[in-house]
Amino acid sequence: MTTRRQFLKTGAAAATGIVFCGCGLRHGAHAEPPVRQKLPILIGGKRVKTIDVHAHCQFREAGTLLGASAAASLVDGRSFNEVAAVAFVEIDKRLAAMDEQGIDMEVLSINPFWYGIERDLAGQIVKLQNEKLAELCAAKPDRFAAFASLTLQAPDLAVQELETAVRKQGLKGAAIGGTVNGEAFSDPKFHPVWAKAEELDVPLFIHPTGIPELSKKLAGNGFLTNAIGYPLETTIALSHLIFEGTFDRFPKLKVIAAHGGGYLPSYADRLDHACLASPKSCNPNILLKKTPSDYLKQIYFDSVIFTPEAIRHLVAQVGVGQVVLGSDYPYPWQLQPLDHIFASASLSDDHKTDILGRTAARLLNFTA
């Protein structure tokens, strides 16, 4: 199986079109536009502030807290050491990369590797990470904002962490996985967390971490646990939030979905027909207030979808006001995260400005 470490090693090679994954595919086979956008970004001669809502980071101190556990497999069959190494915060290196990619501001997040850890240790890790994120944002407020980490396996603790992160540390919401140890976010145990996010008027950034039950099916060449599994995990998470009535219960809850929301935007119309096709599979006690596809207006979708055509399709499905810029930095999925947006002939300059930063600025309550 291709590991993330092996995949990451291809980043520089991929930029020049070298074969990766042993698949015989080339980065150039689905080439990004040749124009490379760098700071400052101008649209119609006007300076535009770009805000990247999908930017990973890690702190070495979290590994210290983990101790020997850092070598154990914690996320999607990968250890903390393997996942974290490429994302350790090196400010000068990160700022230089942001300048090259045309990113004014990153909204930093840490993919949750602690859901399977006992409450006290997980709480220590989350506390440390939120403190470090707040320090980094305070040091470079014009370049960094952040989503808090939450001990979501202990919802009562997560509520306290979110309150502290937003009200005292200035963080802009929270980053969560696609499931918590196999439990869907629609489970009532998580309702207090969603209620707190709604009260604080901050978004939750859903980023998948891997579905253990699919690991065997997706093993082998091609990094399928991520390439296919991650979008699927997001699709499942969002679908449960819709069909179990969570969005009805929390109508002001704001969710940002990584990787363009997985497969949901393309299959939302199929969801609209699901209960018509199989009425017995739908709970008569859960009466949704809207058709399933209408809930896409409560979800924001990042732009980590690679091509101008994919952007056109996403905007057509969910509306331009629901799409925000993402890069997946430092992982080399999309080496030039602005190019496919600029190359999209279907987008007006005003729409591009929205996607690049204006929508995120409103969502996160700061000025673009």
Regions found by a protein language model. Give the residues of each.
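Alpha-helical scaffold segments that form or flank carboxylate-/histidine-based iron centers
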Residues: 51, 150-153, 157, 256
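Short aromatic-enriched loop/helix-cap "lid" or pocket-rim segments at secondary-structure transitions
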Residues: 62-66, 121, 216-219, 267-271, ...
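Divalent metal-dependent hydrolysis catalytic cores, especially in the metallo-beta-lactamase
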Residues: 77-87, 93-118, 143-151, 172-176
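Residue-level preference for long, well-ordered alpha-helices that form the structural scaffold
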Residues: 83, 87, 122-129, 154, ...
